[in-house]
């Protein structure tokens, strides 16, 4: 019996429904009219008409189904409900494809304990569900999306989904048709797919082998229009395997939607309900609206996956301070995740004491020397530099920077010495990233350090009493997985301690703008009002306008009586500076006298009389330092220019434990991209593998040498590098967004700061610029005028940790002289700070030094292979090779554009050829030259970008052509930067070596 319908309202007749089917849909929060428009109950032979219609189905000569298929589908005769929608690919007519939920489901042949809940048309490709909706739902979606319904759309027989497609209405993709119906009911244009992998297809041959790239199913492709917001909202599952399966599906489908230029976001259901329909019914529409408003971009969501700790906690806490936590003696790997300022270091101090009571030595591994010294001071253990002159030596263990985990270091490190002992890796996430990517001392012996770390982990975990502690506010699966992968076949279950306590750090005022002038203006006003302030900076060099040194100079000029302490890597290692060695004793350094007061976080705190009005700190103060003094600082200020990770910014702001206002300026986009800059782990790894193979092949071909290397050295380390690189690259693209979101998660209330008047902020810019320039000019002159030292003196200075400013200048001068081979002038110092050396080096080997290039690359390659005992760390190896970059520039005929006197314009044939070639090979150019090319760039923009890698450019000389067709003209003008002198020095150096 047909349904009697009334437009705008439906007279519901239950003839087409069995009661349990009706109730099932109602219990999912679905509007009755939507149910009636799309769902019906079927029984007997009728379900066959809906499911068994494909011409691909094999039948007997009389047209009857084969016995096997009859047996397979016999269960559908017991009845069930059927649902289908409309077909956007067939003029929005009703879709033949749909789904049937049998009352008596059949067993899954592959999973005998599981039943197949839903049946879809046999031998037909899966489709998506576009449910019919009543007018009231259409209007509700219109109101929520803010997109009107023109009369022409309302009167169009193609209806609601044509309007959604035509007007770029945001859509939500869910798994399961009832979930889509539920979201439509509350005003969201929801599309359902039958499974998490049903939004895309991967071409395969008859044997199941993949023969092409994944692509969106046509239904979704139709709606994947540019700038449309598409949210993906799949079920929340508890099974680890299922969770991973769902996440992979979201990544793949999300990437394909992003390729179509959709704005892809992901809604993560918080639980406990599994599906979005259950969530809406249990928590209400307002709760889902909030989830929708807070949904994350695909990039943000992917990054978050690498930052989560999903290991089941053995101990869950929710307390301000960790206090005493008893760890069973049988536990080998202890993972501690607790917010900043909750007493992690204090708790670890107790664990160190316990190890000593049990006659176990303790190895403390950090990524910063100052942090290691501070921790050792707290733990009562010598830092490695103190071992020699200490009465206890290394009897209790020692602290060491991870850079020194090799035999040639001061530690003379041997992983076999730590059997049955304890290892503590504090701020483990930063330690591992420093190990895998830092360009500091560790890069020289990274392979050796990686080998020793792996042996250390295996020795400790395989010993009866050995223990490893991983501790950080940001420890994640990535860190735990990495350590477990290094353990190899040694199976250990992590003993995870999770403290869910979230401090209430107070207000954080965020300053907009392209530079932090408004923040400095606000700090000026705060200083005039009195109090004491902590200013955190991401830079420290004299050249940086917003770094520690320039700002110190600027504040001293503006406030001559202000007592300022600068804390950065130079000041803390300068014996003549007040900040020398201050990291381990910061609370005392900041103050004069005092008396003990109440306990904070399980340790005696001391309240002191003020000594400094302004403390300016670099990332030397990033981790492992706890400023516990109360009532001292009025506010914390931060200038973050995109060179630290987002987590490091949050760490730095949390060094002061007291709840005072934070004021920050964060650059919109960062600058520290890793690898090829991708946020895809697969892309990063594929790029490194391909570049390594190319480098080896080119060298072998060029010098006929056999480069036998272990290309598969520690794949677990390289995979962890790629995971972390994805996080860093995504953060750098949306740097400010990531930092602010992280601060919100830390409990801050982020508030937009008031704008500062143009005159006041411009005055700040002028004063900072003047201070920076004066300081930097003085430094360049001081370096150039410093005493020239011998090679042996230079080596001693390089190995020396504590250096005066004079010694740093001498070391810098010797380094520049060694690098360029010419007299060191203030101008040379300036240019070197401006990244001149890599530009000159590439230009030299493209031209005068081309004959020495293979020898140069081969020498570097053989050195790395020898140091690593046939193993290489691919990112380091690839950075050291120049031959592929030079070959690419030669292929692009770049030398043609360096011919003086030739005039160039964008329409020139040679420039258009260059553009076509660079666009065609843009990914190769990105991987080897680090230059990003897009189709939208002009030919002139492309050549200028390529020439900038050589420190060169085409100069604008004017416009030519008729008034209607005037074009900008350019020509190459040889630079007057004295690079010829450097090239000559390099040539003479090569000749001298060959003569010897």
Language-model features: locations:
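SF2 helicase catalytic motif II
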Residues: 414-458, 467
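Conserved SF2 helicase motif VI
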Residues: 627, 633-661
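Interdomain hinge/linker at the junction between the two RecA-like core domains of SF2 helicases
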Residues: 477-526
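TOPRIM fold recognition
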Residues: 1-29, 33-35, 71, 163-169, ...
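Inter-Walker segment of RecA-like/P-loop motor cores
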Residues: 379-417, 579-604
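Phosphate-handling DNA/RNA-contact segment within nucleic-acid enzymes
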Residues: 59-228
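Conserved strand-helix element at the start of the C-terminal RecA-like helicase core
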Residues: 360-372, 475-479, 520-555
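Long, low-complexity intrinsically disordered regions enriched in Ser/Thr/Pro/Gly
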Residues: 571, 587, 594, 660-996
């Amino acid at each position: 019996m047909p349904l009697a319908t009334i437009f705008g309202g439906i007279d519901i007749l239950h003839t087409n429904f069995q009661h349990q089917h009706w109730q099932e849909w109602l219990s999912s929060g679905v509007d009755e009219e939507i149910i009636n428009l799309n769902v019906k109950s079927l029984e007997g032979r009728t379900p066959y008409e809906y499911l068994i219609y494909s011409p691909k189905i094999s039948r007997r000569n009389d047209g009857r189904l084969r016995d096997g298929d009859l047996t397979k589908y016999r269960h559908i005769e017991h009845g069930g409900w059927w649902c289908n929608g409309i077909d956007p690919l067939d003029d929005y007519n009703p879709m033949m494809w749909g789904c049937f939920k049998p009352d008596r489901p059949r067993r899954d042949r592959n999973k005998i304990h599981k039943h197949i809940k839903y049946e879809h048309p046999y031998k037909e490709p899966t489709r998506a569900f576009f449910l019919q909706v009543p007018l009231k739902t259409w209007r509700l979606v219109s109101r929520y999306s803010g997109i009107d319904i023109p009369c022409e759309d309302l009167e169009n027989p193609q209806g609601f989904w044509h309007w959604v497609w035509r007007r770029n209405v945001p859509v939500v993709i869910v798994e399961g048709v009832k979930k889509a119906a539920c979201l439509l009911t509350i005003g969201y244009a929801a599309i359902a797919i039958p499974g998490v992998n049903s939004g895309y297809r991967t071409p395969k041959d008859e044997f199941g082998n993949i023969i092409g790239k994944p692509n969106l199913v046509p239904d979704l492709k139709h709606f994947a229009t540019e700038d449309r917001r598409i949210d993906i909202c799949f079920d929340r599952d508890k099974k680890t395997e299922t969770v991973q399966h769902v996440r992979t599906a979201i990544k793949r489908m999300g990437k394909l939607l992003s390729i179509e230029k959709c704005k892809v976001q992901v809604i993560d259901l918080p639980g406990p309900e599994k599906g979005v329909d259950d969530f809406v019914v249990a928590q209400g529409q307002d709760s889902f609206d909030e989830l929708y408003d807070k949904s994350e971009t695909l990039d943000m969501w992917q990054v978050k996956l690498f930052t989560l700790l999903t290991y089941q906690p053995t101990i869950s806490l929710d307390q301000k301070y960790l206090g005493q936590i008893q760890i069973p003696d049988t536990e080998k790997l202890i993972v501690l995740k607790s917010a900043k300022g909750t007493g992690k270091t204090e708790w670890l101090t107790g664990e160190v004491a316990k190890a000593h009571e049990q006659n176990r030595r303790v190895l403390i591994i950090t990524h910063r020397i100052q942090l290691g010294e501070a921790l050792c001071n707290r733990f009562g253990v010598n830092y490695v530099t103190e071992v020699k002159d200490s009465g206890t030596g290394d009897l209790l263990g020692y602290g060491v920077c991870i850079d020194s985990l090799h035999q040639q270091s001061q530690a003379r490190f041997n992983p076999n010495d730590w059997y049955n002992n304890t290892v503590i890796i504090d701020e483990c996430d930063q330690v591992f990233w420093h190990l895998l990517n830092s360009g500091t001392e560790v890069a020289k012996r990274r392979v050796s350090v990686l080998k020793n770390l792996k042996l250390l982990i295996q020795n400790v975990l395989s010993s009866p009493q050995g223990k490893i502690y991983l501790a950080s506010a940001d420890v994640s699966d990535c860190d735990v997985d990495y350590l477990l992968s290094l353990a190899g076949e040694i199976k250990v279950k992590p003993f995870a301690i999770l403290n869910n306590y979230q401090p209430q750090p107070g207000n954080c005022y965020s300053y907009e703008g392209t530079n932090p002038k408004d923040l400095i203006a606000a700090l000026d006003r705060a200083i005039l009002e009195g109090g004491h302030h902590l200013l955190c900076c991401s830079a420290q060099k004299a050249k940086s306008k917003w770094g520690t040194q320039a700002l110190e100079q600027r504040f001293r000029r503006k406030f001559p009586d202000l007592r300022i302490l600068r804390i950065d890597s130079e000041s803390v290692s300068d014996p003549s500076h007040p900040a020398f060695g201050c990291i381990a004793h910061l609370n005392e350094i900041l103050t004069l006298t005092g008396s003990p007061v109440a306990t904070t976080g399980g340790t005696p705190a001391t309240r002191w009389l003020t000594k400094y009005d302004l403390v300016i700190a670099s990332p030397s103060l990033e981790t492992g330092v706890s400023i516990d003094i109360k009532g001292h600082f009025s506010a914390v200020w931060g200038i973050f220019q995109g060179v630290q990770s987002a987590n490091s910014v949050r760490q730095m702001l949390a060094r002061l434990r007291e709840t005072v206002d934070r004021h920050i300026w964060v650059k919109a986009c960062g600058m520290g991209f890793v690898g090829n800059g991708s946020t895809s782990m697969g892309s990063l790894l594929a790029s490194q593998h391909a570049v390594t193979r190319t480098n080896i092949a080119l060298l072998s071909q060029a010098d006929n040498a056999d480069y036998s290397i272990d290309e598969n050295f520690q794949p677990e380390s390289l995979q962890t590098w790629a995971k972390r690189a994805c996080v860093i690259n995504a953060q750098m693209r949306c740097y400010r967004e990531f930092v602010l979101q992280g601060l919100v998660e830390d409990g801050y209330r982020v508030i937009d700061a008031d704008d500062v008047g143009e005159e006041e902020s411009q005055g700040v810019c002028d004063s900072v610029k003047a201070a920076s320039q004066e300081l930097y000019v003085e430094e360049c002159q001081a370096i150039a005028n410093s005493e020239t030292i011998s090679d042996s003196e230079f080596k001693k200075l390089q190995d020396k940790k504590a250096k005066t400013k004079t010694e740093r200048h001498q070391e810098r001068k010797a380094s520049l002289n060694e690098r360029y081979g010419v007299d060191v002038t203030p101008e040379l110092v300036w240019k070197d700070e401006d990244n001149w050396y890599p530009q000159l080096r590439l230009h030299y080997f493209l031209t005068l030094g081309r004959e020495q290039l293979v020898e140069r690359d081969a020498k570097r390659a053989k050195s790395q292979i020898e140091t690593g005992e046939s193993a290489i760390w691919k990112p380091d190896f690839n950075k050291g090779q120049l031959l592929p970059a030079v070959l690419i520039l030669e292929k692009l005929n770049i030398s043609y554009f360096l011919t003086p006197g030739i005039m160039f314009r964008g329409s020139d044939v040679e420039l258009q050829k260059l553009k076509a070639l660079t666009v065609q090979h843009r990914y190769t150019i990105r991987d080897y030259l680090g230059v990003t090319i897009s189709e939208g760039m002009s030919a002139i923009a492309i050549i200028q970008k390529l020439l900038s890698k050589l420190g060169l450019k085409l100069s604008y000389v004017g416009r030519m052509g008729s008034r209607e067709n005037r074009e900008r003209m350019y020509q190459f003008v040889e630079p007057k930067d004295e690079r010829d002198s450097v090239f000559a020095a390099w040539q003479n150096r090569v000749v001298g070596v060959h003569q010897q």
